[in-house]
């Protein structure tokens, strides 16, 4: 496995500068944001002429690969929510937002193809996450599932044309957020290979899910991994629960995102289970830890994870007792 960096953490720096920083610390991959207006990747520009080859060559010059293109915001508005909740992503009517999100996700797949990148990470959206509870409208979740099939099925048709896979990141406020909803989504999509997951263990322990269960149940569908931790703050969780509101730096929170090794994710178990299901791609570090700087995060993360990576599989026993 390789350890990579999600460059969205460093949008105030030029991409070449970020690549130099990551490479110098021992990172081997970058995950590039693809949403409109970000300075690291302009989808329209990269699809012109030889720009994709030029960009890939620049990144490769630092000894890095591009593990994925990430487009969480624009994927979100395919299924919602709409209104002012997502005006920062794209202002407009519900129909205008769906159209924009759909077109942008297809263009992200096109750019991934041009860059030789096998996967796009992102969100699928969810118009009303509160519908996980069947009152006051018991068919609300089923309605959203049908919209998921209709809208994302068309997007995935284009992903198939471009030879790119989509890795949804299970997360609160998404139609797919846990093991059961992930398995259900595979069923809804008819098992098509373009549909899979960006496994982020922090998002799962947020909801008290054993991350090993997700790895084992979704084997063959994990196309990308985020190296992010989450801390269950034991002295607060009995008061606020796992889904507290308010500032992420608030002392009373029962949960907060952390860098790997500083939270509650069992990393030795994660890095045992992933090879067992055949995952040998990238662990992409994403900095969302509000307790420490980016410099702390980027240096501490690789120092923590690198020694945990299993370099070679078990060779078997060859003594007489095991013949």
Feature roles, as predicted:
Residues 11-22, 99-111, 207-216, 267-270:
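Short, acidic/polar
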């Amino acid at each position: 496995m390789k350890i990579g960096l999600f460059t969205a953490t460093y949008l105030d720096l030029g991409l070449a500068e970020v690549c130099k920083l990551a490479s110098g610390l021992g990172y081997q991959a970058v995950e590039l944001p693809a949403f409109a207006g970000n300075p690291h990747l302009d989808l329209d520009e990269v699809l012109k002429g030889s720009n994709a080859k030029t960009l890939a060559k620049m990144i490769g010059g630092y000894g890095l690969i591009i593990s994925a293109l990430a487009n969480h915001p624009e994927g979100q508005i395919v299924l919602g929510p709409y209104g002012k909740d997502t005006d920062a992503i794209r202002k407009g009517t519900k129909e205008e937002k769906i159209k924009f999100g759909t077109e942008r996700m297809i263009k992200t797949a096109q750019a991934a193809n041009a860059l030789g990148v096998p996967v796009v990470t992102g969100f699928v959206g969810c118009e009303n996450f509160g519908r996980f509870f069947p009152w006051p409208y018991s068919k609300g979740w089923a309605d959203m599932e049908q919209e998921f099939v209709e809208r994302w099925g068309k997007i995935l048709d284009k992903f198939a044309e471009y030879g790119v896979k989509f890795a949804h990141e299970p997360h609160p406020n998404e139609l797919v957020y846990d093991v059961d909803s992930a398995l259900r989504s595979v069923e809804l999509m008819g098992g098509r290979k373009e549909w899979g997951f960006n496994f982020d263990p922090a998002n799962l322990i947020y909801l008290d899910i054993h991350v090993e269960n997700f790895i084992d149940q979704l084997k063959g569908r994990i196309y990308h991994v985020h190296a992010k931790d989450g801390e269950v703050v034991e002295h607060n969780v009995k008061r606020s629960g796992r889904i507290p509101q308010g500032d992420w730096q608030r002392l009373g929170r029962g949960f907060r995102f952390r860098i790997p090794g500083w939270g509650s994710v069992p990393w030795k178990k994660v890095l045992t289970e992933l090879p067992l299901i055949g995952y040998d791609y990238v662990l992409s570090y994403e900095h969302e830890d509000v307790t420490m700087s980016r410099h702390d995060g980027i240096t501490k993360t690789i120092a923590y994870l690198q020694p945990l990576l299993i370099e070679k599989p078990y060779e078997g026993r060859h003594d007489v007792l095991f013949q």
